[in-house]
Design a protein with these regions (language model features):
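Hydrophobic/aromatic-rich structural module bridging two neighboring secondary-structure elements via a short loop
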Residues: 59-87
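Amphipathic alpha-helical scaffolding segments comprising HEAT/armadillo-like alpha-solenoid repeats
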Residues: 3, 24-36, 57-69, 92-107
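Structural detector for internal amphipathic alpha-helices that build alpha-solenoid repeat scaffolds
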Residues: 4-25, 44-57, 80-94
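Short inter-helical turns and helix N-cap capping residues of alpha-solenoid HEAT/ARM repeat scaffolds
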Residues: 38-42, 74-76
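Short, well-structured alpha-helical interface segments that form or flank functional binding sites
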Residues: 44-47, 62, 77, 100
């Protein structure tokens, strides 16, 4: 499946849990969701990423550095959702990326 097909499939899928299932099978779904979260402040993408990070944190963890970019964008709602994703990823934080952002968390 190419990137355009994946993007269209996400848009056409009404049920978020179906997008979560798709993300578990198709590697391009997570970067597309992160891009939507960062560039469009897409709440649906944020919610799907929260679900994905709860269910399969190892799939989302490689994108940790991209996800934390949302902390400095948009509003408190986006920051709150981003912290939820990060909290879910901490159980698999084998590269200790938390150390880079923990001061930002405690200052919030």
């Amino acid at each position: 499946m190419n990137i355009n097909e994946v993007y269209l499939r996400i848009i056409e899928t009404e049920n978020d849990s179906d997008v979560v299932k798709l993300a578990k099978k198709e590697v391009m779904v997570i970067p597309i969701l992160i891009n939507a979260m960062l560039d469009e402040n897409n709440c649906r993408a944020q919610n799907i990423l929260i679900d994905l990070s709860e269910q399969t944190p190892l799939l989302v963890y490689p994108y940790f550095q991209y996800i934390i970019q949302a902390l400095d964008r948009y509003d408190n709602f986006t920051a709150w959702n981003t912290w939820r994703i990060i909290a879910n990823l901490l159980i698999v934080d084998y590269l200790e990326m938390w150390e880079e952002i923990k001061d930002k968390y405690f200052a919030a």
